[in-house]
Amino acid sequence: MVREEVAGSTQTLQWKCVESRVDSKRLYYGRFILSPLRKGQADTVGIALRRALLGEIEGTCITRAKFGSVPHEYSTIAGIEESVQEILLNLKEIVLRSNLYGVRDASICVKGPRYITAQDIILPPSVETVDTAQPIANLTEPIDFCIDLQIKRDRGYQTELRKNYQDGSYPIDAVSMPVRNVNYSIFSCGNGNEKHEILFLEIWTNGSLTPKEALYEASRNLIDLFLPFLHAEEEGTSFEENKNRFTPPLFTFQKRLTNLKKNKKGIPLNCIFIDQLELTSRTYNCLKRANIHTLLDLLSKTEEDLMRIDSFRMEDRKHIWDTLEKHLPIDLLKNKLSF
């Protein structure tokens, strides 16, 4: 972080992308400006955005590979230049772009001799490789080579304990961090009481999303993080004086859903997708991450199941019920639903 004194002034709070470039398929750069900010605000925004960009942005990567009958990851396979460990490291570096949630399957199946690159990966329709030239292995002999892969969207750095996988399946330490680096600098403007600050933010990504997309997602995550403080009164939360005890409001979410289930006949609930329920993007993403794709998936969950979903909050429960209450009665009148 660099702080400098510069001359100039701005009249209204605004942000702008002042520079954007693509250095390579796996390196995007963007530079943004936010101003005017009061003294100290630039540091607050800069620190929060930097942490959110580096730790809260989701990415898609390969998390597991299955080679068949391979005794351990340090084995070598006849006709392949690289060891199993080297192939796993190459797979770890593959950059993928997608908006999927949950685990998906992919594969590689080729015949040598030839070089295997990222373009040889057979991916689900919603996933694509950012750089098809990324190397995986070199087949030096005319052999058939197949790998089964697992792909997952997550955030941060995920590790698994190494074991002797007798079925030839090996975990890959997933690095779901599409933002490579973030820098910010602060410039002070004005004189006396009219002094204000300008925040410059630099973002580098791996090509799976643009710096502008990363900035948008980080900002949205920060907003979601602070929403509970804004709605605490509306939710009817209360603290008892002089007692370290929190009394949450009564919520009959599961009871109401149970009542809904009793009256449904006709169209299968697995034909109604949660995309049709007009949920907020935050609630929708939480459900998708938990592999809840249809109304049947949603109604089969208990209240405890929902609250165990990562980042799922009390407001999300209320929002889901309000949405169901708004839309389902009409559907029930026209087409009685059933499981």
Swiss-Prot record:
BP terms from Gene Ontology:
DNA-templated transcription
Gene3D superfamilies hit by this protein: 5' to 3' exonuclease, C-terminal subdomain, DNA-directed RNA polymerase, insert domain, RNA polymerase, RBP11-like subunit
- Catalytically driven reaction(s): RNA(n) + a ribonucleoside 5'-triphosphate = RNA(n+1) + diphosphate
Its predominant location is plastid
- InterPro entries from the xrefs? DNA-dir_RNA_pol_insert, DNA-dir_RNA_pol_RpoA/D/Rpb3, DNA-dir_RpoA, RBP11-like, RNAP_asu_C, RNApol_insert_sf
Which controlled-vocabulary keywords does the entry list? Answer: Chloroplast, DNA-directed RNA polymerase, Nucleotidyltransferase, Plastid, Transcription, Transferase
Q: Which SMART domains match?
A: RPOLD (SM00662)
Q: What class of enzyme is it?
A: transferase
Q: Which GO terms describe its molecular function?
A: DNA binding; DNA-directed RNA polymerase activity; protein dimerization activity
Q: Which GO terms describe its cellular component?
A: chloroplast; DNA-directed RNA polymerase complex; mitochondrion
Subcellular location per the Swiss-Prot or TrEMBL entry? Plastid, Chloroplast
Q: What is its EC number?
A: 2.7.7.6
- Record-linked NCBIfam families: rpoA (TIGR02027)
Instruction: Name the family.
Output: Belongs to the RNA polymerase alpha chain family.
Give the matching HAMAP family.
Answer: RNApol_bact_RpoA
Quaternary structure and partners: In plastids the minimal PEP RNA polymerase catalytic core is composed of four subunits: alpha, beta, beta', and beta''. When a (nuclear-encoded) sigma factor is associated with the core the holoenzyme is formed, which can initiate transcription.
Q: What name has this protein been given in UniProt? A: DNA-directed RNA polymerase subunit alpha
Q: Which species?
A: Hordeum vulgare (Barley)
Q: Which gene encodes it?
A: rpoA
